[in-house]
Regions:
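Sequence context surrounding c-type heme c attachment/ligation sites in exported
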Residues: 17-69, 118-173
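Early transmembrane hairpin module of multi-pass membrane proteins
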Residues: 8-13
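Primarily the internal scaffold of c-type cytochrome electron-transfer domains
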Residues: 55, 64-121, 169-173
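Hydrophobic membrane-insertion alpha-helices, especially the h-region
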Residues: 1-4
């Protein structure tokens, strides 16, 4: 019983929280082909990939104040919708787009974590990305197609063990 239970701990497959600022991976990593590790740079060097600092967003969005890409009118993803989300980013970081300065008046964003592994699980992003060369999509799914990010895989112990078996990971050394 206990083994079966442990194999299913933390199943949140399909979990798709609404974030305080809408962020479309479909636009950023899909249409614009921004590499995952540009924003999630800590995945290369750390146990955790983490949520990027808004400063990373501002690397581009200091100069991109309006959305000028494809729309999905059926779902309400219009140019105005996306532009308003950029304005939320500006408000959060205290960016005055007219004066093009940071005001110091910031409002921290309370992002909702999507992938929550139990405390007893040891997972190291850097080990998987650098040593094994695992593509982000292996665990995170087709992120470049996700308008709203969600937990693609179950990330259970059984799911991980199955991947290790299929890829012949040497767990003895």
């Amino acid at each position: 019983f206990a083994y079966g239970w442990l194999m299913q701990v933390g199943i949140d497959q399909g979990y798709m929280p609404i974030q305080p600022i809408h962020y479309s991976h479909k636009i950023h990593s899909g249409a614009n082909q921004i590499d995952c590790q540009y924003c999630h740079s800590s995945a290369r060097v750390s146990k955790h990939s983490g949520i990027p600092s808004l400063n990373v967003c501002m690397n581009c969005h200091e100069n991109i104040a309006e959305y000028d890409g494809e729309e999905d009118l059926e779902k309400g993803y219009t140019k105005d919708f996306y532009t308003n989300e950029i304005k939320k980013l500006y408000k959060a970081v205290g960016w005055d787009e007219n004066k093009r300065i940071y005001t110091g008046d910031v409002e921290p964003v309370k992002w909702v974590r999507i992938h929550n592994l139990p405390d007893f699980v040891y997972f190291n992003h850097a080990q998987h990305v650098n040593v094994a060369g695992v593509e982000c999509q292996t665990c995170h799914g087709p992120v470049e197609e996700m308008e709203i990010a969600y937990q693609h895989s179950s990330l259970t112990m059984g799911w991980c063990i199955n991947c290790h078996r299929e890829t012949n990971v040497n767990v003895k050394d």
